C-alpha cells in the first residue's frame, strides 16, 4: 500500500472526475485537492474537485459533488463519500484502510514520509551568511534553524539539496574588523592607548568592542610580538600589519561561527567567499552578461522618496534595467567613481550559483533585508532567462525574555544575546524546536523559562516526552515475562483488529497525514509545519496514554491479551517512528527517556 493515502485518493478522485468530464484541461485538474477534514465527524478527507470543475463544465457544483460521491463511495479504501456544503465531497476511510497503514509505517521506518514531489530538482538553500565580524546572535540562530530544517524537509520530499553559507569577507565591515582586532592586539602587548584614542585615530572608528576579539589580539601578540606596533606601542602604518591582522581575525571568527553552527546541529556543505568571487573577476563577468542582454545603461536615477539608499547619487552610474523584471526602479551596479555597488557583488554570487547547476535558489534572510528582495529576484530572472527562480524566506526578529522581562545583553558580545549564550542556557533541542513554533515571517518571543519547563506549554518537552513514553512501552514489552516481540518486522505482521477505540483511530489518522505534511511543508517552504504536526501528534498519543490509565482495556501491555498487546505495540512503534522521523527533519534529538 502507498505511504501517502491522500495522494492515492486524489488520483482516484481525478480518475472519477475525468470519467465524468473528459473535456477538463490538465490545468483545471491540477487544482483538485484532497485535504484532511477539520472535523473528524465529517470524515477523514475532503476534496474540492466538484467546485473546481463545475464552472468550466457548466454544472451545478452540488450536483457534481453528488455524482462524484456516488462514484467514489464504492472504492475499496472508503467506507463512504458524501457531498457537503456548496460542493465539497467528504471521504471516510474504512477501518481496514487506516489499520493497513500501520504495517506500511513499520516497514518503512524513519523513511516513512519520504516523497518524490521534489523529483530530484537541484535546490540551493543559502542561510545564515552572517558577517564574520563577531559571534552569532539570536537573529542568526533563527535563520540557521529555519534554513537547516527547510533543507531537511525538502530533501525528505525528494529534492536534491545543497546547503550554503556566503562568507561576506570583503567590504567595509571586514575593514572595521581588522582595525578592531588590531586594537585588541595593542592591548595584548601592553599599549597604553585607550579605546577613545584608538577610535579617533582609525579610518573606520572602533566599531566592534566586544570581548570576543580579545583572543584574536592575544593570538596576534603570540605570533608577532610587538612587531606590528610602533616602538612606543602605538598605531603603526596599516601597510605593515593590516592584511595579516584581518586574515587572522577572519579565520578565527569563521572558526567560531562554524563551531556555533555545529553546536546548533547545522552543517553546511558549501562556504562561498565573497572576496574569492571578486578576485576571480566574477563581478565583471556578471555585468558583461547583463550588458550582452541589453540590460545595462549609463544614467542618473531620480532622487528617491523618503530615506536615501546608500547606492544613490545624483551623478551618472552604471544601471541595471530592473524595472523590466518587476522591480520599482532600475538599480546601480557601478558608482560614478567606477567602484562596484554591493548589489553588483550579490549579482556575481547568484550568477555563480546558477553556473554551478542550481535549478531553484532559496535565500533565508533577516526581515531587515526585505527591501532587497525585488531587485535580487529581478536580476536572477534576467541572468537565467527566467529558468531559475529565486525564493526569499524572511525571518523576523526574536525577543528573548526571562520572567516576562527582556534579556538584552551578553557580557562577551556587549550588545546582544549570542547563540552560544542561548545554547548554554536551554540546550540545542529546545532552541531548534522553539524557533520553529512560529512561522518565520512572524516576530517571536523566546521564553527562557518556558524552554526548560517540563509542561505541555514547552513543545520540545511535550514531543520528546511522547517519544520517550513510546520507547518505555517497547522496553517494558521486551523485558516482560512474556517477552513480546517488539521488532518492526514482527509487529508489521500483527493482527490489528483490536485497534478499534476512537482514540486509537484518531492517532492513526494523525500518523497517516505525515507524508502529505512533508510534501506540503517542502512545497510551501514552511518547515514550521513539521513542528506543529509533531505537537499535535504528541497530543494524540498522550491522550491515548491517559485514557489507558482510566480504562484497563486500552493499556498497551496486557498479559492476558496477546493479540491486543501486539496490535497496540505496533501502534506505539509506528508512533515512535513517525515522531523520530519528524524530529530528524527539525534536527532535534528523539529522547529515549526523560530525566
Indicate residue ranges for each PLM-predicted region.
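Short, charged, solvent-exposed linker or helix-capping segments at domain edges/interfaces
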Residues: 100-105
Amino acid at each position: 500500500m502507498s505511504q501517502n493515502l491522500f495522494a492515492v485518493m486524489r488520483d482516484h478522485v481525478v480518475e472519477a472526475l475525468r470519467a465524468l468530464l473528459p473535456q477538463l484541461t490538465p490545468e483545471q485538474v491540477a487544482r483538485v485537492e484532497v485535504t484532511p477534514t477539520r472535523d473528524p465527524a465529517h470524515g477523514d478527507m475532503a476534496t474540492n474537485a466538484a467546485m473546481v470543475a463545475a464552472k468550466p463544465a457548466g454544472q451545478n457544483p452540488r450536483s457534481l459533488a453528488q455524482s462524484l460521491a456516488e462514484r467514489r463511495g464504492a472504492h475499496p479504501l472508503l467506507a463512504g463519500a458524501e457531498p457537503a456544503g456548496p460542493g465539497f465531497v467528504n471521504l471516510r476511510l474504512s477501518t481496514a484502510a487506516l489499520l493497513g497503514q500501520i504495517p506500511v509505517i513499520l516497514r518503512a521506518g524513519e523513511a516513512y514520509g519520504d516523497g518524490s514531489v521534489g523529483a530530484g530538482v537541484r535546490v540551493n538553500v543559502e542561510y545564515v551568511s552572517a558577517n564574520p565580524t563577531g559571534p552569532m546572535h539570536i537573529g542568526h540562530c533563527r535563520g540557521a534553524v529555519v534554513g537547516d530544517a527547510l533543507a531537511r524537509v525538502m530533501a525528505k520530499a525528494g529534492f536534491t539539496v545543497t546547503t550554503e553559507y556566503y562568507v561576506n569577507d570583503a567590504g567595509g565591515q571586514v575593514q572595521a574588523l581588522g582595525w578592531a582586532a588590531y586594537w585588541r592586539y595593542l592591548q595584548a602587548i601592553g599599549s597604553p592607548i585607550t579605546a577613545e584614542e584608538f577610535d579617533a585615530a582609525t579610518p573606520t572608528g572602533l566599531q566592534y568592542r566586544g570581548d570576543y576579539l580579545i583572543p584574536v589580539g592575544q593570538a596576534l601578540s603570540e605570533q608577532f610580538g610587538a612587531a606590528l606596533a610602533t616602538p612606543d606601542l602605538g598605531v603603526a602604518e596599516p601597510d605593515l600589519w593590516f592584511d595579516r591582522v584581518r586574515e587572522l581575525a577572519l579565520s578565527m571568527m569563521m572558526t567560531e561561527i562554524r563551531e556555533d553552527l555545529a553546536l546548533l546541529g547545522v552543517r553546511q556543505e558549501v562556504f562561498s567567499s565573497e572576496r574569492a568571487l571578486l578576485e576571480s573577476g566574477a563581478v565583471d563577468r556578471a555585468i558583461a552578461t547583463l550588458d550582452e542582454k541589453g540590460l545595462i545603461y549609463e544614467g542618473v536615477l531620480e532622487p528617491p522618496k523618503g530615506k536615501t539608499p546608500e547606492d544613490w547619487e545624483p551623478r551618472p552610474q552604471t544601471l541595471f534595467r530592473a524595472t523590466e523584471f518587476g522591480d520599482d526602479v532600475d538599480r546601480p551596479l557601478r558608482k560614478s567613481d567606477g567602484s562596484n555597488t554591493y548589489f553588483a557583488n550579490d549579482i556575481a554570487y547568484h550568477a555563480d550559483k546558477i553556473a554551478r547547476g542550481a535549478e531553484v535558489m532559496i535565500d533565508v534572510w533577516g526581515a531587515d533585508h526585505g527591501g532587497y528582495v525585488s531587485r535580487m529576484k529581478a536580476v536572477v530572472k534576467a541572468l537565467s532567462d527566467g529558468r531559475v527562480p529565486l525564493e526569499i524566506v524572511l525571518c523576523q526578529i526574536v525577543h528573548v525574555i526571562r520572567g516576562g522581562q527582556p534579556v538584552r545583553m551578553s557580557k562577551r558580545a556587549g550588545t546582544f544575546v549570542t547563540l552560544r549564550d542561548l545554547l548554554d542556557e536551554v540546550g540545542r533541542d529546545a532552541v531548534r524546536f522553539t524557533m520553529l513554533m512560529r512561522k518565520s515571517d512572524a516576530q517571536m518571543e523566546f521564553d527562557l523559562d518556558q524552554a526548560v519547563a517540563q509542561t505541555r506549554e514547552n513543545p520540545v518537552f511535550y514531543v520528546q516526552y511522547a517519544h520517550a513514553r513510546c520507547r518505555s512501552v517497547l522496553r517494558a514489552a521486551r523485558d516482560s515475562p512474556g517477552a513480546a516481540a517488539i521488532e518492526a518486522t514482527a509487529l508489521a505482521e500483527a493482527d490489528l483488529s483490536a485497534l478499534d477505540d476512537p482514540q486509537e483511530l484518531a492517532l492513526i489518522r494523525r500518523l497517516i497525514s505525515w507524508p502529505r505534511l512533508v510534501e506540503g511543508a517542502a512545497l510551501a517552504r514552511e518547515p514550521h509545519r513539521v513542528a506543529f504536526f509533531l505537537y499535535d501528534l504528541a497530543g494524540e498519543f498522550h491522550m491515548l496514554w491517559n485514557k489507558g490509565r482510566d480504562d484497563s482495556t486500552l493499556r498497551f501491555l496486557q498479559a492476558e491479551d496477546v493479540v491486543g498487546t501486539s496490535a497496540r505495540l505496533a501502534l506505539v512503534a509506528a508512533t515512535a517512528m513517525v515522531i523520530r522521523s519528524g524530529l530528524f527533519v527539525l534536527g532535534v534529538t528523539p529522547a529515549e527517556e526523560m530525566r
